[in-house]
């Protein structure tokens, strides 16, 4: 009887050792840049690997989504992976928010199934039709985004216009979904380490 109780307690303790939520695209919150590079992703590019914030971009993921696009990962020193974004270009063949709307709504439905109703919806434009993408270049004219939250994760789905002049036969915008996992405790941990460095005097 005692042994069964001990086993049960051990299972509970082990299950509580890693309470991080599941990260998207087959990645893991807290994983390192080196582990990410070892995952054989296509088109991997790394910048500021040894900096406070490191960045990795790739054309694939361990568990890719159904659309073609790019994956952007951010790593915080001492914490590992803290944000992951997928972005896909839309409406290459026109200036209306057509393909983009279809993909945006499809992703929104999938996010709602997994994370529940969005906590914030900001979807408005003063100029629609073939001016939609020009309008959302300026937040005072329009924005198209939804924000979700679950288990300490913040998820933002948004539509953004391409920079500069919009050109025929090129995507007019991007639909992206960004996941961030950075709790207050994690921020305090990083700040504590940085404060100790600043206070140290080894001269």
Q: How would you label these PLM feature ranges?
A:
Residues 2-8:
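Sec-dependent signal peptide recognition
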Residues 3, 57-59, 67-70, 132-134:
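Residue-level detector of functional hotspots within protein domains
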Residues 9-11, 111:
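Membrane-embedded hydrophobic alpha-helical segments
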Residues 13-16:
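C-terminal motif of bacterial Sec signal peptides marking the signal peptidase cleavage site
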Residues 19-57, 89-203:
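Non-cytosolic coordination micro-motifs
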Residues 61-105:
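Mid-chain, structured segments of secreted extracytoplasmic proteins
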């Amino acid at each position: 009887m005692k042994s069964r109780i001990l086993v049960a307690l051990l299972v509970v303790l082990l299950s509580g050792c890693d309470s991080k939520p599941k990260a998207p695209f087959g990645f893991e919150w807290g994983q390192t840049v080196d582990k990410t590079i070892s995952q054989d992703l296509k088109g991997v590019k790394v910048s500021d690997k040894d900096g406070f914030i490191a960045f990795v971009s790739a054309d694939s993921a361990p568990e890719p989504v159904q659309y073609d696009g790019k994956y952007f990962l951010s790593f915080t020193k001492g914490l590992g992976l803290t944000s992951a974004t997928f972005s896909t270009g839309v409406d290459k063949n026109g200036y209306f928010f057509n393909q983009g709307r279809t993909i945006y709504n499809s992703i929104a439905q999938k996010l709602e199934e997994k994370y529940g109703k969005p906590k914030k919806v900001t979807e408005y434009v003063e100029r629609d039709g073939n001016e939609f993408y020009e309008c959302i270049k300026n937040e005072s004219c329009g924005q198209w985004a939804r924000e979700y939250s679950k288990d300490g994760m913040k998820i933002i789905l948004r539509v953004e216009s391409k920079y500069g002049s919009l050109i025929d036969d090129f995507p007019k915008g991007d639909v992206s979904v960004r996941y961030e996992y950075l709790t207050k405790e994690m921020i305090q941990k990083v700040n504590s380490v940085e404060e100790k460095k600043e206070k140290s005097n080894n001269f």
